[in-house]
Curated annotation (Swiss-Prot):
Taxonomic lineage of the native organism: Bacteria, Pseudomonadati, Pseudomonadota, Betaproteobacteria, Burkholderiales
Statement: the UniProt record of this protein carries the keyword Coiled coil: no
Subunit structure: Homohexamer.
Protein's name according to its UniProt entry: 3-octaprenyl-4-hydroxybenzoate carboxy-lyase
CC cofactor note: Binds 1 prenylated FMN per subunit.
Family recorded in the similarity comment: Belongs to the UbiD family.
Gene giving rise to this polypeptide: ubiD
Organism whose genome encodes this protein: Bordetella bronchiseptica (strain ATCC BAA-588 / NCTC 13252 / RB50) (Alcaligenes bronchisepticus)
Length: 514
């Protein structure tokens, strides 16, 4: 599916019967989450709440939810016709990350053409004026309370801005970083920026604080960017390629960007809403001193304004612990005329991140095969919170092979550094079929011999089951057939029906009355 921007994408979804306009009044507090959750679990359409109510009053704009509520809509957003076609996207990314040596002149020319398209033809196009800056709120007009930000769960500490595309640039970076990090409103012009320490935005901020201590760090947050740009921010794009370039490849046209009004950052020109501002040094007169609740640990000494974030209901199905993160002070809000507020919720799977994981699973397979060519298939079950459990099938070639694959998966892509459980099966097992996976585990595994336990590894900070926040264990399960050296016993012989008998039964089947 080809489209220009979010509005064009929504128009095409509506023609396909994949967008439902909700005209009844619906509150952004809890009601929207319950409706979206029921529709997502039923595999239903994207939802446009045209009569949203916010803070017991009509909202100034409609709210879009469940945009990526099915794998097919994720594929359409990435410019593919179906989920299976995302393997081609993965092949493209694999080639850009680690190009293989050409097999001949024709192959060499094809690779040059691909690199030219990625690195030059699809470089973002800067425009002088843009729809995202048709309306500007500055100074006292900045009021995040006017945006219909959802309160998703009863125990949430505040509303939650969940689909913000955060744009940063480190002092030594050649390109901008785009990432999606949740943000907690603190007041009319402040948000807590919850990014984990290894994410691109946090790394850019760390480098800035080291290179320019005591200087404000510019940030822009785009809401309602086109789907390719949003999805580019959650895809393992190689460091040589910007998310804007990757979005252009997906969309088939260069991403148009415009310079932010208050910084040198480039923002998506067609975004519905853009927040501009800075992370402020702690001694800036606009900064607010951190309030430390009784019994809580004080904030880390970053030299910048910090605040205690959470708790919020999260993709784990639980409320997360509170933690300290930097505060984003919003200097201005720009937007299109009649903007659409793009929102989502996270909760016990399936939710929108889980659906994204199912679709992006197809992108990961070629990337992993480039590093571990013995991989046949790879699956992240959505009920495993998108990334905490992986099942991989391999062409086993030697004793100990499964263990090599486990450690390879934990190391190849940053996306899998938090994967707690890896199950390795042979190529005759479909990793997407739990009946086959469980059969392999219960017949090909010895719990002591075939279980790998690793202590003190990086773990998602939202994982309260780990003994220490951010640090915990990993488990690998070798459910492959065992080779000499792995067992001294005679291995089981699998049962298979005689092929001649199967053909005879096929021939008589229609006469059996079954």
């Amino acid at each position: 599916m080809k489209y220009r921007d979010l509005r064009d994408f929504l128009a095409q979804l509506e023609r396909q019967g994949e967008l439902k306009r909700i005209t009844a009044p619906v509150s952004t507090r809890l009601e929207m989450t319950e409706i979206a959750d029921r529709v997502l679990r039923a595999g239903g359409p994207a939802l446009l709440f045209e009569n949203a109510r916010h803070n017991d009053a009509p909202a100034d704009m409609p709210v879009l939810a469940n945009l990526f509520g099915t794998p097919r809509r994720v594929a359409w957003g990435m410019g593919a016709d179906d989920v299976g076609a995302l393997r081609e996207t993965g092949e493209l990314l694999a080639s850009l990350r680690e190009p293989e040596a050409p097999k001949g002149l024709r192959d060499a020319l094809a690779k040059v053409s691909m690199l030219k398209a990625a690195l030059w033809d699809m470089s973002p196009k800067t425009v002088r004026s843009a729809a995202c800056q048709e309306i500007v709120w500055e100074g006292a007009d900045v009021d995040l309370g006017r945006l219909p930000i959802q309160t998703c769960w009863p125990g949430d500490v505040a509303p939650l801005l969940a689909w913000g595309l955060v744009i940063t640039r480190g002092p030594n970076a050649r390109r901008q970083n785009l990432g999606i990090y949740r943000q907690q409103p603190l007041g009319p012009n402040k948000l807590i920026m919850r990014w984990l320490s290894h994410r691109g935005g946090a790394l850019d901020f760390r480098d800035h604080a080291q290179a320019h201590p005591g200087k404000p760090f510019p940030i822009a947050v785009a809401l309602g960017a086109d789907p390719a740009t949003i999805l580019g921010a959650v895809t393992p794009v190689p460091d040589t390629l910007s998310e804007y370039q990757f979005a252009g490849l997906l969309r088939g046209s260069r991403t148009e960007v415009v310079k932010a009004l208050g910084s040198d950052l480039s923002v998506p020109a067609s975004a519905e809403i853009v927040l501009e501002g800075h992370l402020l040094p702690a001694d800036d007169p606009r900064a607010v001193a951190a309030a430390v609740p009784e019994g809580a640990n004080p904030p880390p000494a970053t030299g910048y304004e910090m605040a205690l974030e959470g708790p919020y209901g999260d993709h784990t199905g639980y409320y997360n612990e509170q933690d300290w993160f930097p505060v984003f002070t919003v200097d201005r809000i720009t937007m299109r005329r009649n903007p659409i507020y793009h929102s989502t919720y996270t909760g016990k799977p399936p939710d929108e991140p889980a659906v994204l994981g199912v679709a992006l699973n197809e992108v990961f397979v070629p990337l992993l095969r480039r590093q571990l060519p013995e991989i046949v298939d790879f699956y992240l079950p959505p009920e495993g919170c998108s990334y905490r459990l992986a099942v991989v099938s391999i062409r086993k070639q030697y004793a100990g092979h499964a263990k090599r694959v486990m450690f390879g998966l934990w190391s190849v892509l940053r996306q899998f550094m938090y994967t707690k459980f890896i199950v390795v099966v042979d190529e005759d097992i479909d990793p997407r079929d739990w009946t086959e996976v469980v059969w392999a585990m219960t017949t090909r595994m010895d719990p002591v011999r075939d279980t790998v336990l690793v202590e003190n590894t990086p773990i998602d900070y939202l994982d309260f089951a780990s003994p220490v926040s951010g640090l915990g264990g990993k488990m690998g399960l070798d459910a492959t057939n065992k080779w000499p050296g792995e067992t001294s016993r005679e291995w089981g012989t699998p049962i298979h029906m005689d092929e001649a008998v199967k053909r005879r039964v096929d021939a008589m089947w229609d006469t059996l009355g079954l």
